Swiss-Prot record:
Organism, as annotated: Oryza sativa subsp. japonica
The protein's name in its UniProt record: Probable calcium-binding protein CML29
Assigned keywords, A-Z: Calcium, Metal-binding, Repeat
CDD domains: EFh
Gene3D superfamilies: EF-hand
Domain EF-hand: 27-62, 63-98, 138-170
Function, as annotated: Potential calcium sensor.
Gene symbol of the encoding locus: CML29
Keyword Phosphoprotein: no
Length: 170
């Protein structure tokens, strides 16, 4: 071990742990959330059986009405006859995709991102990259890919609200 001029051996610096992100899984979850929001016709955060059927069809999963009703009955944890986005992700096995570490990182970044966002509440890849790179957990390329996966309209940015929702759902 090297000895600096002060005479004491230098201590090894802890390495920032790199985040391993399955971008395909993140993109899948993001597409489920976007489809959910598109089919939640009254914007109450819940989908009914007909809305669920349309949502599934939009994802290429055209199911007969009875299968959709069975799926809703199995996934409806609070038995209100509707599915929340969390219940949808559960029934679609999104929780088994191993994105918990990313979710924890994103949740810890939300307060700083709120202050980093522009006046319109929108985050670009550069804001996310700057913050997560400082946290030492994600490369700029990873941050750009995260934004791309979560960017529903393709403008290269996401709102703080969308970011917060995805962080909570992961």
């Amino acid at each position: 071990m090297a000895t600096p001029a002060g005479g004491r051996p230098s201590q090894p610096q802890p390495q920032a742990q790199q985040l391993s992100v399955d971008f395909e899984a993140l993109s899948y979850i993001s597409s489920l959330v976007e489809a959910f929001q598109a089919f939640d016709s009254d914007n109450d955060g819940l989908v009914t059986a007909p809305e669920l059927r349309g949502l599934l069809a939009s994802l290429g999963l055209d199911k007969p009405e009875h299968e959709v009703r069975d799926m809703l009955a199995r996934a409806d944890a609070d038995r209100d006859g509707k599915l929340s986005v969390e219940e949808l992700l559960d029934v679609m096995n999104a929780g088994q995709l191993g994105l918990g570490a990313l979710g924890a990182l994103l949740q810890s970044a939300v307060p700083a991102l709120e202050s980093a966002a522009g006046p319109d509440g929108v985050l670009g890849a550069d804001e996310l990259a700057r913050l997560l790179s400082v946290m030492g957990t994600a490369s700029v390329e990873d941050c750009m890919e995260i934004i791309a996966c979560m960017d529903g309209d393709g403008d290269g940015a996401i709102s703080v609200e969308e970011f917060r929702l995805m962080a909570q759902l992961l």
